[in-house]
Design a protein with these regions (language model features):
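Cation-handling catalytic/transport regions enriched in His/Asp/Glu
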Residues: 1-158
C-alpha cells in the first residue's frame, strides 16, 4: 500500500484533516495515554488525579472555540460574497465587526486577525475552503472512533 498517496493534501479535502483529528482521541483515553505519556526521568505515568482533572477540563471553553470558528466562517463568506470597499469601507473594520458578533468579549479596536488568516487568503497549497475540513473531520472522527471504543482502542484488528 502506498502511504505517500494517503499523506497530507494528497487526499480529498473532506478527508484531509481526519487522520490528525482522530489521533487526538487516543490521548484522551487512559490506556492510550499510558502508551507514551510518562515522566522523562522516572517513567512514572500521569497520576490518576491529574488525569481526571484533565478529562474534566477537556471541553473547557469549547463554546468559545466553536464561536470563533463560526466567526471565521461568517467573515470568510461575507468578505467573498458581500464585501464592497466603496460601500463597506475598511476591510479590517468590516471583518472585525463580523468577528465581534461571534466573540464573548470585546475585540480590541485594532484587532487584525484576518490579516494573518493565511489559511483562507494566502495559503501556499490553496487551502481556502479546505480550512473548514477541520469541522467536518470532527464529525468524521467522532463517528470513526466509536468503532475503536467498541472494539478496543489498541485492537490491531480495527
Amino acid at each position: 500500500m502506498s502511504v505517500r498517496s494517503l499523506a497530507g493534501t494528497n487526499v480529498a479535502w473532506d478527508f484531509v484533516e481526519l487522520p490528525s483529528q482522530i489521533m487526538e482521541n487516543w490521548c484522551w483515553e487512559r490506556s492510550g495515554l499510558d502508551l507514551f505519556a510518562a515522566h522523562y526521568e522516572t517513567n512514572e505515568r500521569i497520576p490518576d488525579e491529574l488525569y481526571e482533572k484533565m478529562a474534566r477540563a477537556r471541553t473547557y471553553r469549547a463554546a468559545n472555540a466553536q464561536m470563533r470558528q463560526l466567526g471565521f466562517a461568517a467573515a470568510d463568506l461575507a468578505l467573498h460574497q458581500d464585501y464592497d470597499s466603496a460601500r463597506d469601507g475598511d476591510v479590517m473594520a468590516y471583518g472585525r465587526e463580523i468577528l465581534q458578533r461571534h466573540s464573548s468579549t470585546k475585540l480590541p479596536d485594532d484587532y487584525a486577525m484576518l490579516a494573518g488568516f493565511g489559511h483562507l487568503f494566502a495559503h501556499p497549497v490553496g487551502y481556502a475552503a479546505g480550512y473548514y475540513s477541520y469541522k467536518w473531520a470532527e464529525v468524521l472522527d467522532a463517528d470513526a472512533f466509536t468503532r475503536f471504543k467498541k472494539e478496543g482502542i489498541t485492537n490491531p484488528e480495527v
